[in-house]
């Protein structure tokens, strides 16, 4: 699913949810934003709600923080948690969720420096790497979590990744020198590493040579720590484990016996941590005549042998993660691959305590990214304090964002404080930016953060551990009780094909479909998030998934669950684009000038100066097939120096126009980056383009690409041509003038070295500004294609919407009229249907492409026979509403249900109208009996509950497969007949949000080619301004027909009689 109607669901919820008593607000103020229900529990996985926080003074005169907490859903049974020593500094507040480790005696927990831990927001899982990096600078760690794409790839990172993989393969195979050479060669030839070499402009042979320098150390390490004859042959080390007791000798010999797992992914909702352990190894600790066996994390480092606090801290955190799967390892092993030197790292209580306190500080900063006080405006919260370590800042990858956030956000606050020594650096990093640029950054940063924190938009996965699969299955986003069948097939390194079946019975009804991203977990609590991947194939008995880990090592009896990986609001990419827009580069400066400063776009005067002589005949031939507005669009784009906006009104052949534009640009020798928000929109253009034998490169995950386009994907080309060298990959990237991807695919390495002559963005009016920005950095000129009179960008958060987040870049730039070309000749609607949109939205600009289009009516070959039946059952010729609805020569009618009556029903599930639903089914069944194909009929309703009611009634009737969907799903598509059920009908004047949106109404009334039937209660719908305007027009044209008054049961009887016939 690419673009779903979450906005509609959100608006529906806002209508039928009751207001909560203010007394309960404090309990839910943050919890509700994280999860729809407060899930509390005792025991090992306890989750407590904090009800009150007090600072008290102990008898010894020390300050303590006393928390009144409860694990009771009814909030009746309360307990006390006493925080002592440094735990007092944990920024815990009423309404927070916490997890406690320790002992509870007489309903009292005591957490102090010697015993116990408190985990704040345990459902927020933070990586061990992030926490370790926060030791030197908490601000950098928080920025890296926020602006993820700003941490650039480096040569050393690539070499580190390759070395990790070689070591990990060797530990499961052999450390023989010739084997290591073979593994290194194979690993360097893998496409993902070649792509990084391309990004970083590296030489493949040089990288191979540098990797090979490490290999002797690999063999040395294996010789030292594996496969010796006696325990004394292993190196001596100093390691004391708590379980050995305080009197134990710390000297021991360490033997690594075997590798149990590679890149073991562990999520720990107990400690609020997540991470991937490089290698999980079995270790024998020989101490005198005693031997102890432990399973430990082995962390690999490729940089300088520092045994630094960050490196050691990572291992300490991995010991906590390991406890989710097995006994406490009490220590970990730190191996520097350059030298083969290995250090044991004990996990002492003090270290774990301080690291978990750091984790809590970081969680607090990430959770409280918004400051919102009652009656005050919402604003971004300040980040952790800027440190005064210029050497650390000098090499910090987040320095630009640090300074930018300080200038744009924090320095606008009254209590802003920046260390004096850092002022010159902040000024240097941001001096190229005007105040208006900083305001743009601050506003969009706020709106994106608000959107990401919407209840229906949180990118949290706590349902995996908080809700059983059986419950989640009801939502359609999960399948539980799965067992693995057949052998795991290795597609390539990092892709493993797994087949699953339900342990008992068939696969339940689900929303999961091929191409959907998923997270695979075990049903038991120790096996959260074992692997990530996507659904390859799904049917009633089997689910086939491509996963990033081979799970064949788990017992055959293991029960699994699949959870859909929702990415409704992936703000990493738009925040990265926003940050990039503020950079001091030529491309960013140009976009700031055009987008923020509204510099007038420039145009060339004569086509002859841009049209190559050899391309003139080809271009002229292509132009012959276009109408006048389309030809004007081609000319405007060719003459542009900056950008062009093409307004694609309904039915005007937007996709054909884009395809033609690409053909012309290709003929002129221009390079083109073709993008859109959805994969389907990109592929719709490519499907047309492929017919003209024009080559292109399609980027993106192959499972998301249309089957007929997959042969043009990078993945398929690399596979079919067996590309294993950087030279061949470069040749592929340089061979195609046209590259296509979605707006979210702009982190691909090709964009690090390629600038296109033109970037074309389809669906531009539906894409939020920071997302749309992404591809524009990589082109000299851009073309936005859309129509802001149709669906806007999807924004779930009301506050973000009110601040202006639904303004697309297309809408923002449309004020420069000289850059706008309108496509006004449409080939979809007949003249009567078109007139509605002309009156409502387009001020008479739309025109039919031909008389044939203007006069087209629905073809119903069996209509005469059906008319006779209707005459018999319903006195057809005496019923104006039946004539209006079914006569082919009446293309438009509004059936007013006010007198029927047809009241709405408001339930927890949403808003529906059973009478309208039955009318829709009746109308549909008549049209099908009259000879219309089910696939030529579209049913639209604004509320999901109504869609469900209509779908259920259709399933019970003899009607075939008719598409029932929301307006959002019909954007860009059409049907011969469209029936719209408006649902709302009440006496109390209640208004919902959905029908207030004139753009949705415009889309709804422009989907039909030959017949448009609107159903609703005129008095109720007249309260909505957009509908009032439409109804006034329909009334003036005498197109509103009142359904007969009287007992509505008799009408139901009539409909039933006809359907049974």
UniProtKB/Swiss-Prot annotation:
EC number: 3.1.-.-, 3.6.4.12
Catalytic activity: ATP + H2O = ADP + phosphate + H(+)
Cofactor section: [4Fe-4S] cluster
Comment on bound cofactor: Binds 1 [4Fe-4S] cluster.
Keyword Ribosomal protein: no
Annotated keywords: 4Fe-4S, Acetylation, ATP-binding, DNA damage, DNA repair, DNA replication, DNA-binding, Endonuclease, Helicase, Hydrolase, Iron, Iron-sulfur, Metal-binding, Mitochondrion, Multifunctional enzyme, Nuclease, Nucleotide-binding, Nucleus
Protein localization: Nucleus; Mitochondrion
Binding-site residues, ATP: 648-655
PANTHER family attached to this UniProt entry: DNA REPLICATION ATP-DEPENDENT HELICASE_NUCLEASE DNA2, DNA2/NAM7 HELICASE FAMILY
Similarity section: Belongs to the DNA2/NAM7 helicase family.
Subunit structure of this chain's protein: Interacts with BLM and WDHD1.
Protein name: DNA replication ATP-dependent helicase/nuclease DNA2
Organism of provenance: Bos taurus (Bovine)
GN (gene name): DNA2
């Amino acid at each position: 699913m690419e673009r779903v109607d979450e906005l509609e669901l959100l608006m529906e919820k806002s209508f039928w949810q009751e207001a909560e008593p203010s007394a309960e607000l404090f309990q839910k103020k943050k919890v509700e934003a994280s999860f729809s229900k407060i899930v509390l529990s005792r025991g090992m996985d306890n989750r407590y709600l904090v009800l009150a926080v007090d600072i008290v003074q102990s008898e010894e005169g020390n300050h303590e923080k006393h928390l009144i907490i409860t694990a009771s859903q009814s909030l009746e049974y309360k307990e006390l948690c006493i925080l002592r020593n440094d735990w007092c500094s944990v920024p815990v507040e009423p309404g927070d969720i916490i997890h406690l480790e320790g002992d509870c005696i007489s309903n009292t927990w005591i957490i102090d420096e010697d015993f116990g831990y408190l985990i704040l927001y345990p459902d927020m899982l933070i990586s061990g790497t992030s926490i370790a990096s926060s030791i030197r600078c908490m601000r950098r760690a928080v920025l890296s979590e926020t602006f993820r794409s700003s941490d650039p790839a480096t040569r050393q990172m690539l070499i580190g990744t390759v070395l990790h993989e070689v070591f990990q393969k060797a530990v499961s195979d052999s450390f023989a020198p010739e084997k290591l050479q073979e593994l290194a060669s194979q690993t360097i030839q893998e496409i993902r590493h070649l792509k990084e070499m391309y990004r970083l402009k590296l030489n493949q042979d040089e990288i191979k040579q540098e990797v090979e320098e490490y290999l002797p150390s690999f063999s040395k390490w294996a010789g030292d720590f594996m496969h010796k004859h006696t325990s004394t042959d292993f190196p001596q080390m100093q390691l004391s484990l708590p379980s050995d007791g305080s009197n134990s000798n710390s000297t021991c010999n360490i033997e690594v016996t075997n590798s149990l797992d590679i890149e073991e992914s562990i999520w720990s909702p107990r400690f609020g941590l997540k991470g991937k352990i490089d290698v999980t190894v079995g270790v024998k600790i020989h101490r005198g005549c005693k031997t102890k066996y432990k399973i430990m994390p082995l962390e690999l480092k490729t940089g300088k042998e520092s045994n630094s606090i960050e490196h050691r801290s990572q291992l300490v955190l991995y010991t906590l993660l390991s406890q989710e799967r097995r006994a406490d390892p009490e220590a970990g092993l730190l191996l520097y691959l350059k030298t083969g030197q290995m250090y044991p790292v004990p996990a002492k209580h003090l270290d774990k305590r301080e690291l978990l306190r750091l984790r809590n500080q970081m969680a607090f900063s990430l959770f409280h990214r918004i400051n919102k006080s009652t009656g005050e405006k919402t604003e971004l919260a300040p980040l952790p304090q800027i440190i005064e370590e210029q050497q650390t800042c000098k090499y910090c990858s987040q320095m630009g964002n640090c300074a930018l956030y300080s200038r744009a956000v924090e320095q606008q606050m009254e209590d802003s404080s920046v260390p004096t020594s850092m002022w010159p650096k902040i000024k240097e990093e941001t001096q190229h930016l005007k105040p208006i640029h900083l305001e743009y950054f601050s506003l969009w940063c706020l709106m994106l953060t608000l959107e990401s924190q919407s209840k229906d938009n949180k990118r949290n996965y706590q349902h995996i551990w908080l809700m059983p699969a059986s419950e989640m299955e009801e939502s359609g986003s999960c399948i539980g009780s799965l067992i693995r069948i057949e052998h795991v097939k290795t597609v390539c390194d990092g892709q493993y094909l797994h087949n699953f079946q339900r342990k008992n019975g068939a696969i339940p009804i689900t929303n999961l479909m091929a191409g959907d991203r998923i997270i695979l977990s075990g049903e038991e609590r120790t096996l959260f998030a074992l692997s990530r991947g996507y659904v390859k194939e799904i049917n009633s008995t089997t689910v086939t998934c491509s996963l990033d880990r081979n799970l064949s090592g788990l017992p055959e009896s293991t029960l699994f669950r699949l959870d859909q990986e929702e990415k409704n609001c992936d703000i990493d990419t738009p925040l990265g684009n926003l940050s990039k827009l503020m950079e001091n580069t030529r491309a960013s400066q140009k976009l700031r000038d055009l987008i923020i400063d509204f510099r007038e776009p420039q145009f060339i005067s004569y086509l002859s100066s841009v049209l190559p002589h050899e391309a003139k005949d080809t271009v002229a031939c292509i132009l012959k097939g276009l109408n006048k507005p389309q030809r004007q669009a081609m000319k405007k784009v060719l003459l542009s120096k900056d950008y062009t906006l093409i307004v694609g009104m309904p039915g005007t052949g937007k996709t054909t126009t884009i395809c033609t534009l690409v053909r012309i640009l290709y003929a002129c020798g221009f390079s083109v980056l073709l993008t859109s928000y959805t994969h389907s929109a990109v592929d719709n253009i490519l499907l047309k383009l492929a017919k003209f034998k024009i080559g292109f490169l399609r980027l993106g995950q192959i499972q998301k690409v249309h089957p007929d386009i997959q042969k043009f994907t990078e993945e398929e080309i690399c596979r079919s041509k067996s590309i294993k060298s950087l030279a061949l990959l470069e040749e592929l990237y340089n061979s195609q003038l046209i590259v296509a991807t979605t707006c979210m695919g702009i982190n691909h390495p090709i964009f690090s070295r390629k600038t296109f002559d033109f970037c074309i963005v389809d669906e531009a009016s539906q894409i939020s500004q920071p997302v749309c920005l992404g591809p524009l950095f990589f082109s000299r000129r851009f073309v936005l294609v859309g129509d802001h009179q149709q669906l806007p960008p999807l924004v779930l958060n009301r506050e973000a919407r009110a601040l202006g987040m639904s303004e697309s870049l297309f809408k923002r730039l449309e004020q420069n009229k000289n850059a706008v070309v309108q496509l006004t000749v449409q080939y979809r609607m007949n003249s009567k249907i078109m007139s509605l949109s002309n009156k409502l939205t387009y001020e008479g600009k739309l025109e039919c492409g031909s008389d044939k289009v203007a006069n087209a009516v629905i073809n119903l070959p069996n209509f005469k026979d059906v008319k006779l039946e209707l005459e018999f059952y319903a006195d057809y010729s005496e019923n104006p509403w039946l004539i209006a609805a079914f006569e082919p020569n009446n293309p438009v009618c509004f059936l007013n249900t006010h007198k029927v009556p047809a009241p709405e029903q408001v339930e927890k599930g949403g808003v529906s109208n059973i009478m309208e639903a039955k009318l829709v089914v009746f109308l549909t069944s008549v049209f099908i009996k009259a000879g219309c194909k089910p696939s030529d009929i579209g049913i639209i309703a604004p509320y999901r509950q109504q869609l469900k009611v209509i779908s259920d009634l259709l399933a019970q009737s003899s009607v075939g497969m008719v598409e029932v969907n929301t307006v959002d799903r019909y954007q860009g598509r059409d049907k011969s007949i469209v029936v719209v059920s408006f649902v709302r009908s009440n006496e109390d004047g209640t208004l919902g949000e959905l029908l207030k949106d004139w753009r949705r109404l415009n889309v709804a009334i422009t989907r039909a080619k030959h017949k448009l039937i609107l159903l609703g209660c005129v008095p109720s719908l007249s309260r909505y301004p957009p509908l009032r305007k439409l109804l006034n027009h329909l009334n003036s044209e005498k197109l509103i027909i009142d359904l007969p008054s009287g007992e509505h049961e008799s009408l139901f009887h009539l409909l039933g009689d006809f359907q049974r016939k």
